[in-house]
Regions:
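A short SAM/SAH-binding and catalytic strip from SAM-dependent methyltransferases
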Residues: 1
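Conserved catalytic/acceptor-binding region of the Class I
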Residues: 5, 9-75
Length: 133
């Protein structure tokens, strides 16, 4: 945040958007998380829940919150698009080797075959409009 703060002029805005799937509200999301943890036990991005959003600690003293919006919504996926969404998370593509990713993909595809081709996954969306102090 200090670098972003440095780039912006006083009063300029910085928008943070977070889109977390909710594993405790979706069997598919929960099973996908368990599979990520099987291949990457150190992954810290699991277990997200609905929560009251607040300005990140790293932004305190640098930005004021002009507006914070948070809401839950169901997002439609196909097996392929959900697999892509999960693969893009830092627990898989940013952390595993190519060989591990291939194994994970095969197992995830097999797991998703147990469900309809199209489904919805609940997500918690947070949008923070921060203003440089």
């Amino acid at each position: 945040m200090p670098k972003i703060h440095k780039w912006l002029k006083p009063g300029w805005h910085f928008l943070i958007t977070i889109m977390d799937w909710l594993p405790f509200e979706s069997e598919i999301a929960m099973k996908s998380e368990k599979l990520i943890l099987k291949y990457n036990p150190a992954w810290s991005g699991c277990g997200r829940k609905r929560s009251t959003p607040s300005v990140p600690k790293c932004a305190e003293g640098l930005f004021d919150a002009k507006n914070i919006i948070a809401y839950a919504t169901d997002i439609p996926f196909t097996s392929e698009s959900w697999s892509g969404r999960i693969k893009a998370c830092r627990g898989i593509e940013a952390s595993l080797t190519s060989a591990e990713i291939e194994k994970w993909e095969a197992e995830h595809k097999k797991m998703l075959a147990e469900y309809p081709e199209s489904f919805k996954i609940p997500h918690f969306i947070t949008i923070m409009d921060l203003v440089k102090i």
